[in-house]
Amino acid sequence: MSEATEVSIELKDIVQEYPGKEGAGVLRVVNGVSFKLERPSIVMLLGPSGCGKSTILHMMGGVRPIGVQTPTSGSVLIDGKPCSEAHDDVVMVFQRYANRPDLTVEDNVSFPFRLKHWRKRVAAAEARSRVDATLKAVGLDGHRKHLPSQLSGGQNQRVALARALVLRPRILLMDEPFGALDAQTRTEMQTLLSEMLLSNPCLVVFVTHDVTEALLLGDRVITLSAQPAVVADDFSILEPRPRSALWQRSSEALKMEERILAQLHAASPGRGSLRVSV
């Protein structure tokens, strides 16, 4: 296992507002969210669809919409320092895997090392070694010369995950990365992520609206209410990963599921939607 590096992200009283439609005031999406994330772990940011989860994740990644102050108020701190733009230690993975269609699997994974910033930080030999090891780890070593169009959706998401992990990020932000995959492929990717993080430990913030996924992957689950989002619940899961199907049917897991659904119903009755996988 790689040596884990301590890292922290802190949100302090985050408020996010956007201009309303046709000049009708403002739309408050996030309403005073605060939490601190520390040490390598998987933190699940769970909430109903459209509640503001992705907005919060993008703030952590320094993604700022043009013409809108982000956040409207409050602050995002990485290792105790204000962060208002893209950060060297932060890498993002999206539901749309954004692989370049004209590049092979190998070239997509190694693409960051073409950029001047990463060429300075990682020697060419080390970059090649990382790419080779990561392709093997995600099960794509035999597909390295294939184009994205020749791959399945799950394989394309493996490419995106490999491209992120090859940079050895201290913080990995994942915006519903497996949400568009079929149930079997989603389960395979969840297992792969857990296994990959054993040898590449980092702080993962994973956005989902799937309660089952949150309980399967999370070391900590932060539940947000419907818009405007507030923190409805925040708890840790001590069961080691990867978690078995038997544990998922245990009384402990079922009580956690009931807790999440009850907290969300109390915080935002009848608004937004969650998924419970079967």
What would you call each of these model-derived segments?
Residues 46-48:
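The feature captures the beta-strand-to-loop junction immediately N-terminal to the Walker
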Residues 61:
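Helix-to-loop junction immediately C-terminal to a conserved catalytic motif
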Residues 103-112:
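Short coil-to-helix segment of the ABC ATPase nucleotide-binding domain corresponding to the Q-loop/switch region
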Residues 126-138, 259, 263:
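ABC nucleotide-binding domain "signature" region
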Residues 147-151, 155:
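Conserved ABC ATPase signature
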Residues 161:
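Hydrophobic anchor residue at the start of the ABC signature
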Residues 166-170:
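A short, proline-enriched helix->beta-strand linker immediately N-terminal to the Walker B motif
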